[in-house]
């Protein structure tokens, strides 16, 4: 299984970097012989071909049905799997270096986004803590020479003690060009006061006036149901106090809301009680920061 995952992610990184340079080569690149999962729920394509021309994927299909352009660079990827880039729907980029905070800068953003790309993650939604440098990189990423993951940003996590304050904070992030509005509504396990519901309602209203989706950090099932009925667009964490019930499932389906369970984040709260298996995985260790280990 480890070899399969390694092969899959390695070819994702190869596709990302090669597609960014093909325009400079003024030609096409054909990845030949892979299993291809196209993300549409269709059956995998065996012995497939992906053709990239001028930095864009032009053709995907079985070898028998794809004509490789004359003069194309051909890369044999037999035994590997190609799939669409992975999306990190809830991340935070650029703020840490090793175990230290306070390192939000362009170089650190580029370092982390490059690491994402090398492991097959091609898009990151950064939901909070984003500063001007992150917005600038977001604005520069629509270029086929890109050699990192794309980033979409929320700006600062929105807080306010009144409806007037919360609307002003939404407007501040919107004026910066945020892609989302991020808010925490829980009590941080009893250490803080929950956001009053009238203030959350005002936040949602103002965000939607500014045509921005609302991503809500939460913990409790009753809050999850409330924000769904109030108009939240992304549930940014798992419900963690109770098992979800039929009412919650029906609400998610009826509202068409994105549910981001952040399961790996939850695993991180207990997996280090003993040494996890991936600490001996060469693929993980290749780019793991020594300060974290």
Regions found by a protein language model. Name each.
Residues 156-205, 226-229, 234, 289:
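Active-site gating/metal-coordination segments in enzymes
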Residues 142-154, 195-216, 252, 256-261:
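Alpha-helix-loop-beta-strand connector modules within alpha/beta enzyme cores
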Residues 109-132, 148-156, 176-188, 213, ...:
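Divalent metal-dependent hydrolysis catalytic cores, especially in the metallo-beta-lactamase
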Residues 27, 36, 42-83:
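Histidine-rich, glycine-flanked metal-binding segment
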Residues 80-145, 161, 222-234:
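Metal-associated gating/positioning segment near the N- to mid-region
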Residues 168-191, 239-293:
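Active-site neighborhoods of metal-dependent hydrolases
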Residues 7-18:
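Bacterial N-terminal signal peptides
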């Amino acid at each position: 299984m480890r070899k399969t995952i390694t092969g899959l992610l390695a070819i994702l990184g190869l596709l990302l970097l090669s597609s960014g340079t093909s325009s400079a080569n003024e030609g096409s690149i054909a990845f030949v012989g892979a299993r291809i999962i196209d993300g549409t729920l269709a059956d995998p394509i065996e012995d497939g071909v992906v053709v990239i021309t001028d930095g864009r994927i032009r053709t995907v299909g079985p070898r028998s049905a794809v004509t490789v352009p004359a003069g194309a660079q051909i890369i044999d990827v037999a035994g590997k799997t190609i799939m669409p880039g992975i999306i990190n729907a809830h991340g935070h980029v650029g703020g840490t270096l090793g175990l230290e905070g306070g390192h939000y800068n362009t170089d650190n953003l580029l370092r982390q986004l490059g690491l994402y790309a090398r492991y097959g993650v091609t898009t990151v939604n950064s939901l909070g803590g984003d500063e001007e440098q992150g917005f600038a990189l977001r604005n520069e990423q629509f270029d086929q020479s890109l050699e990192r993951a794309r980033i979409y940003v929320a700006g600062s996590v929105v807080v306010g003690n009144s409806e007037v304050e919360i609307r002003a904070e939404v407007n501040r992030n919107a004026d910066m060009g945020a892609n989302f509005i991020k808010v925490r509504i829980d009590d941080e396990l009893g250490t803080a006061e929950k956001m009053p519901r009238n203030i959350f309602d005002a936040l949602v209203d103002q965000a939607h006036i500014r045509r921005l989706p609302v991503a809500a950090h939460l913990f409790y099932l009753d809050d999850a149901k409330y924000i769904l009925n109030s108009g939240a667009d992304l549930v940014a964490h798992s419900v963690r106090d109770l098992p979800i019930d039929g009412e919650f499932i029906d609400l998610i389906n009826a509202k068409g809301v994105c549910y981001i369970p952040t399961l790996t984040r939850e695993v991180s709260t207990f997996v280090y009680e003993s040494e996890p298996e991936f600490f001996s995985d060469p693929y993980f260790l290749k780019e793991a920061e020594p300060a974290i280990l």
